Amino acid sequence: MSFASEMKNELTRIDVEEMNAKAELSALIRMNGALSLSNQQFVINVQTENATTARRIYSLIKRVFNVEVEILVRKKMKLKKNNIYICRTKMKAKEILDELGILKDGIFTHEIDHSMIQDDEMRRSYLRGAFLAGGSVNNPETSSYHLEIFSQNESHAEGLTKLMNSYELNAKHLERKKGSITYLKEAEKISDFLSLIGGYQALLKFEDVRIVRDMRNSVNRLVNCETANLNKTVSAAMKQVESIKLIDKEIGIENLPDRLREIARIRVEHQEISLKELGEMVSTGPISKSGVNHRLRKLNDLADKIRNGEQIEL
């Protein structure tokens, strides 16, 4: 089972009070529902590919409106072989849509009805219903952080974005070919959203994976940094040894001033050690990294003068 499916399975087991059930149902029917006319009777069909979501829709409609609901199962055509579950009710169709703020004066509305998001719990419930209806979230173990909710109507996506941002989630929306999506990209905001809609088990799993990923990334960055520093140290040491050998060949190390002669010999004998370690091996007492670096720079400058055929003064 995918991370998104596990999360939806958890969300469908949450107990809610009647007004919160209405808010959740309002999102589910608005986003996945359709109204049709059969035998001069209005029929509501709510469609989903998730079996637990279908059971949730079934139980919420029966509980809130006390009407008969049937679940139909269809096989999806084309490449995907998922089942399609249709929750159908032929009773009180217009009354249900009107009470859920989906139908107003006989006209379908695309905006989120204010009566469905009157308080904090109802807003959370509406967002939970929206995620159950059109939500998906990447597996945090294998993918980049991404959570989105698909809406067929752009104005509903805008309303959903605004509702999510009332909780400072930094949600954004954009148009897609067959609708619009409201999405989150930041791991911290996805965690906040999971908590907001009651997905606490999903939140714990998400945070566990996030911590491991962050630690792994930190270690990788540290290793890369150490590797880069080591490469720089090795390159610098090779250049220094090359310069010292050139000086020895052309002038002779024994002809260098004492301070340069000693550091030159230590560097040639210990090509792998750091500047700090070089400084600790000086016979007159430890000298700082900057002191060692200053002497080695003088040796490099001297070698450059030899290469350029310049006059040398020791």
Curated annotation (Swiss-Prot):
Superkingdom field: Bacteria
Keywords per UniProt: Cell cycle, Cell division, DNA-binding
DNA-binding region of this protein: 274-308
GO molecular function, one term: DNA binding
SUPFAM superfamilies (UniProt xref): Homing endonucleases
Pfam families listed in its UniProt record: HTH_WhiA, LAGLIDADG_WhiA, WhiA_N
InterPro entries: Homing_endonucl (IPR027434), Sporu_reg_WhiA_N_dom (IPR018478), Sporulation_regulator_WhiA (IPR003802), Sporulation_regulator_WhiA_C (IPR023054), WhiA_LAGLIDADG_dom (IPR039518)
Keyword Heme: no
GO biological process annotation, one example: regulation of sporulation
Flavoprotein keyword on record: no
PANTHER family assigned: CELL DIVISION PROTEIN WHIA-RELATED
HAMAP family registered for this protein in UniProt: HTH_type_WhiA (MF_01420)
Family: Belongs to the WhiA family.
Function: Involved in cell division and chromosome segregation.
Name recorded for this polypeptide: Probable cell division protein WhiA
Species of provenance: Staphylococcus aureus (strain USA300)
Gene for this chain: whiA
